[in-house]
């Protein structure tokens, strides 16, 4: 598509990264919109792009104002098999095409309000978990890709994959578009759910055609950066090159196992005590930058103020602050205007950097014991279905959970 007359053409994602620029991603949509009443926890599907476009648009705008350079289409779990999984009505009543098209239109509208790019995103599928063939799974990705091509997104992201095999299938499908492809996996230092180490995952993704690789979701910034470091080492050992990307959770997960925060008993409705502070995220941004990561964003739990923290921490390198910083004093400096003297005394970096945050929950533990069911692709409980989950199926799961808790 030719550039609009009178409008300066935006630099592409690889042009920016190849020049050493910092690209700031956006934050988490499904969790943020679930809290606001627009997404249903459980299926986590993005029909809000059609049903409540104003809510999706506003969240995009807040991330843009906070400093995001990329507007990811709100197409997480927007594959047709997911939109009809376990009794979901979206495919039948709305259609996958309408959801994906609406998400693209909203992202483009907001991206063009600033210097942001639009990334069309696909994620893991019920088809893969149910042991469908490579051809069948790739067909699911292709349905979304056709919409992304029609809407002329700037680049593509294959994100949130627990198995590198499926992530590779996604990259191989997306790369046929001729557009740059990024690929992120929701894995920790132990690797994917089939035991493939992070370094090998990175090598496979790059060989499949990804220009940008890394992690997203499931783990906190500290664990995620350890995983990206292993990916980087894997690429170096294989003499392969790719740009690095990190979009972790905004929840602290030191007690997670291989499955990440989904295994925590608090998932998804009791995670608030684990939320990272803006100062935690500034530390994450600096560590990511020092590691050589240049695409830095967030996933579930990341609100616009977290993205602003990334933009503020890296402002010296980028040369500017985001618009949202107009109402935010650096390291709490605006607290010098507070009426209470002890709060004015907190208007300094040293205070917030060294504060040990209390939870306010005196009888609660600091750590949890993950559920650890150990299920992965091919396990009976992970086989997906079009019909709603039955009472008998739930009863069996409740009994299994009781046994695990004993």
Swiss-Prot record:
Any one GO biological process: 'de novo' L-methionine biosynthetic process
Cross-referenced PROSITE patterns: HCY
Primary location group: cytoplasm
Positions where N6-succinyllysine occurs in the chain: 40, 93, 98, 232, 241, 340, 377
Domain of life of the source: Eukaryota
Pathway where this protein functions: Amine and polyamine degradation; betaine degradation; sarcosine from betaine: step 1/2; Amino-acid biosynthesis; L-methionine biosynthesis via de novo pathway; L-methionine from L-homocysteine (BhmT route): step 1/1
Binding site for Zn(2+): 217, 299-300
GO MF, one annotated term: betaine-homocysteine S-methyltransferase activity
EC numbers on record: 2.1.1.5
Record carries keyword RNA-binding: no
Catalytic reactions on record: L-homocysteine + glycine betaine = N,N-dimethylglycine + L-methionine
Domain Hcy-binding: 11-314
Cell location: Cytoplasm, Cytosol; Nucleus
Cofactors: Zn(2+)
Keywords: Cytoplasm, Metal-binding, Methyltransferase, Nucleus, Phosphoprotein, Transferase, Zinc
Pfam annotation, one family: S-methyl_trans
Phosphoserine modifications at: 330
This protein's record includes keyword Zinc: yes
Cofactor note: Binds 1 zinc ion per subunit.
Disulfide cross-links: none
Cellular component aspect of the GO annotation: cytosol; extracellular exosome; nucleus
Self-association and partners: Homotetramer.
PANTHER family: BETAINE--HOMOCYSTEINE S-METHYLTRANSFERASE 1
Job of this protein: Involved in the regulation of homocysteine metabolism. Converts betaine and homocysteine to dimethylglycine and methionine, respectively. This reaction is also required for the irreversible oxidation of choline.
Name this polypeptide is given: Betaine--homocysteine S-methyltransferase 1
